[in-house]
A protein has these predicted regions:
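Structured, hydrophobic secondary-structure cores that serve as assembly/anchoring elements
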Residues: 1-224
Length: 224
């Protein structure tokens, strides 16, 4: 679609990509320009099929585009930084001489600088909400007591442990006990559980620092 700087976009459930891409229409024998949305659906699907939903659908490994002939415009490094930062949230599609056309960003449209301004984090939470909601359905209409709270913790922990092992989470903690399920909560026929997660961050900058050491000195002395 068309992005307008007058629209107050602010959501972690959406993302914007730019520029448009050109493909060959074999039916009509012409080249046409298309918005990147369709290509991005393919990138997301490829990323999910080859890795996991918490891996960013971007970069040379999962964000490489092979179908487009060319991009409408290839933003420079400075332009990409401007699109991606400084309060903006446009994911650039960049063209590199050796690596072709690649998705070079994974920001959501959330303006508040939290973990949810990244696509991989939002998709991780969507996955957890779906899987864990299904896992605890069997507890509905069970007695609302400590035994049920323990069962809930045991039901959700394996999935969280699995994500931690598979590089989806750095760490987590599940709280479902009398501290959150107070008499008032129980009186409402409700169970509350708080799942604290430390989502996995992605590498978006690489800094290489070169240090020249004097002849005769050891690297141990030079490292600081």
């Amino acid at each position: 679609g068309v992005y307008s700087d007058h629209a107050a976009f602010n959501s972690s459930y959406a993302a914007v990509y730019w520029p448009w891409l050109q493909i060959y229409d074999a039916v009509n024998g012409v080249k046409v320009w298309c918005p990147p949305s369709g290509f991005m659906a393919g990138v997301y699907a490829y990323s999910d099929n080859t890795t996991e939903v918490w891996f960013a659908p971007a970069g040379l490994t999962r964000g490489h585009l092979t179908q487009p002939i060319k991009a409408e415009y290839s933003p420079s490094l400075g332009e990409r930084d401007l699109l991606y930062g400084n309060g903006n949230a446009v994911n650039p599609i960049a063209t590199f001489k050796q690596d072709g056309i690649n998705v070079w960003g994974q920001r959501t449209l959330q303006r508040l600088p939290t973990a949810l301004d990244r696509i991989n984090v939002r998709r991780t939470l969507l996955y957890l909400e779906k899987v864990l909601s299904t896992a605890v359905r069997g507890l509905l209409f069970e007695p609302n007591d400590a035994a049920t709270w323990t069962r809930l913790r045991r039901l959700v922990t394996p999935t969280l442990e699995s994500l931690k092992t598979r590089r989806g989470l750095q760490d987590f903690k599940v709280v479902c006990d009398s501290t959150v399920n107070t008499p008032d909560v129980v009186e409402q026929n409700m169970v509350k559980a708080y799942i604290y997660v430390k989502p996995m961050k992605t590498v978006e900058m690489i800094q290489l620092n070169f240090v020249i050491t004097a002849q005769g000195s050891s690297f141990t002395e030079a490292i600081f």
